[in-house]
């Protein structure tokens, strides 16, 4: 099954728009992950993702934990990220969710050569190669996938 993977921070969740996000993370405060605003119309995104699942695509998350971390903080960040997904994409039944150590190559979760990645980080897109896109391309690319599947 071809997977459509999403990064969270800076891609669908505006972590970097939260006031004082970096000092908070350095103090092991997971609040910015929970408080991040959405970066696109989530009801539209959810509709596209659900339609794509019905035509055979898998939907997944690959998101990094905080750069500075402890086991307890990693657990709190994971809970905050899962809570954010549940709040903003409640109707999406994700096939896979990987919340992993900061810097883990996202390519290690690629399942097929056709897998797609949406990520704001240039290095991740470069490592992924073809079928990697910026956050502002999400809706247009999902529309194209649906059109091609029909």
Outline where the language-model segments fall.
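Acidic, Mg2+-coordinating phosphoryl-transfer loop and its flanking beta/alpha structural elements
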Residues: 112-150
């Amino acid at each position: 099954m071809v997977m459509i993977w999403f990064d969270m921070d800076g891609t669908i969740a505006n972590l970097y728009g939260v006031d004082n996000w970096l000092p908070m993370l350095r103090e092991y405060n997971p609040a910015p992950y929970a408080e991040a605003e959405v970066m696109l119309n989530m009801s539209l995104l959810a509709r596209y993702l659900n339609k794509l699942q019905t035509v055979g695509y898998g939907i997944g998350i690959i998101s990094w934990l905080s750069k500075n971390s402890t086991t307890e903080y990693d657990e709190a960040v994971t809970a905050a990220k899962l809570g954010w997904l549940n709040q903003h994409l409640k109707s999406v039944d994700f096939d896979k969710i990987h919340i992993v150590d900061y810097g883990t190559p996202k390519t290690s979760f690629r399942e097929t050569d056709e897998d797609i990645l949406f990520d704001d980080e240039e290095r991740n897109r470069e490592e992924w190669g073809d079928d990697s896109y910026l956050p502002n391309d999400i809706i247009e690319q999902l529309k194209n996938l649906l059109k091609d599947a029909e």
